[in-house]
């Protein structure tokens, strides 16, 4: 089944061109199937690019998915037009009465700020608490993952001496995990962050289990043994050129930045990078969506009632 998004959303045509099935409201109604309700809390400055990346992954599922785009209320986006936000987004205040089968919280370029210094931290805490009763399963990504694991488990983040930046080999630590079904023993994942969480802090909690890790970059994916929250600290959703875009952005503005590790062919920025993580990104999100489908109540309003 395809993903249901507005046909005027910029991502619509790109997804069609990429072979991702998308559907209109009319077709969705005709199928008479309850779609999985997936919310995307988009904290990234370039919201259009992030919409496409996430829609591409959740839309590849054989299940019908309805994606709702959500933003923090009162926070002005710097790189996305107000017209786009008004046309396609709702604030969390506007959707907090709803229940969602799945909920994605993205990263944000505010890693170096203490959580309490983030202007929308109080609302972020409210949203995280709300997911416990109104969301069946949550996928937290990069800063969103660090914020969530700090909020729920007190796991701190640490500033790195230099940016973790590039494509790094990771290990599958639990092949039997429902979220790693079909994963290779080793695989590559894009990394782009100034902070990290550490294994020692995560292992202090009996509720957390590390599923993916890199000998160079540390912890990548954590899940809650008895919960339905995933914490992805890197960027499996990235496009082939995402790291390149970040690199040249910093070079052109004079920001000190090293070339991304293991990314450009022959370490030559003039050569187009090859995407070596796409299949595992689809596996992870596909496994997550399938687990939601297998375990979520048929009546979406019953989500949270088993607590």
Swiss-Prot record:
GO terms for cellular component: cytoplasm. Pathway: Amino-acid biosynthesis; L-methionine biosynthesis via de novo pathway; O-acetyl-L-homoserine from L-homoserine: step 1/1. Its EC number is 2.3.1.31. Keywords: Acyltransferase, Amino-acid biosynthesis, Cytoplasm, Methionine biosynthesis, Transferase. Gene3D superfamilies: 3.40.50.880. Belongs to the MetA family. This is Homoserine O-acetyltransferase. It comes from Rhizobium leguminosarum bv. trifolii (strain WSM2304). The gene is metAA.
């Amino acid at each position: 089944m395809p993903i249901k998004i507005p046909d005027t959303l910029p991502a619509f045509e790109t997804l069609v061109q990429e072979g991702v099935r998308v559907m209109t409201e009319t077709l969705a109604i005709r199928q008479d199937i309850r779609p999985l309700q997936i919310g995307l809390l988009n904290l990234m400055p370039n919201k259009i690019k992030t919409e496409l990346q996430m829609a591409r992954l959740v839309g590849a599922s054989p299940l019908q998915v309805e994606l709702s785009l959500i933003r923090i209320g009162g926070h002005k986006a710097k790189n996305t037009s107000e017209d786009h936000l008004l046309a396609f987004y709702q604030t969390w205040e506007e959707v907090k009465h709803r229940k969602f089968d799945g909920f994605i919280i993205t990263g944000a370029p505010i890693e170096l700020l203490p959580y309490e210094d983030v202007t929308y931290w109080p609302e972020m805490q409210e949203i995280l608490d709300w997911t416990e009763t109104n969301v069946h399963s949550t996928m937290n990504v990069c800063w969103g993952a660090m914020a969530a694991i700090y909020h729920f488990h007190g796991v701190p983040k640490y500033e790195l001496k230099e940016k973790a930046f590039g494509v790094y080999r990771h290990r599958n630590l639990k092949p039997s995990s429902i979220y790693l079904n079909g994963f290779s023993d080793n695989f590559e994942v894009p990394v782009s962050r100034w902070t990290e969480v550490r294994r020692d802090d995560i292992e202090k909690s009996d509720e957390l289990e590390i599923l993916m890790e890199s000998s160079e970059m540390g912890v990548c994916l954590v899940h809650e043994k008895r919960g339905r929250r995933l914490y992805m600290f890197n960027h499996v959703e990235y496009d082939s050129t995402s790291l390149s875009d970040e690199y040249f952005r910093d070079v052109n503005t004079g920001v000190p930045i090293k070339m991304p590790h293991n990314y450009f062919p022959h370490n030559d920025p003039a050569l187009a990078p090859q995407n070596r993580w796409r299949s595992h990104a689809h596996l992870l999100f596909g496994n997550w969506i399938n687990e939601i489908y297998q375990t979520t109540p048929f009546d979406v309003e019953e989500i949270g009632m088993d607590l």
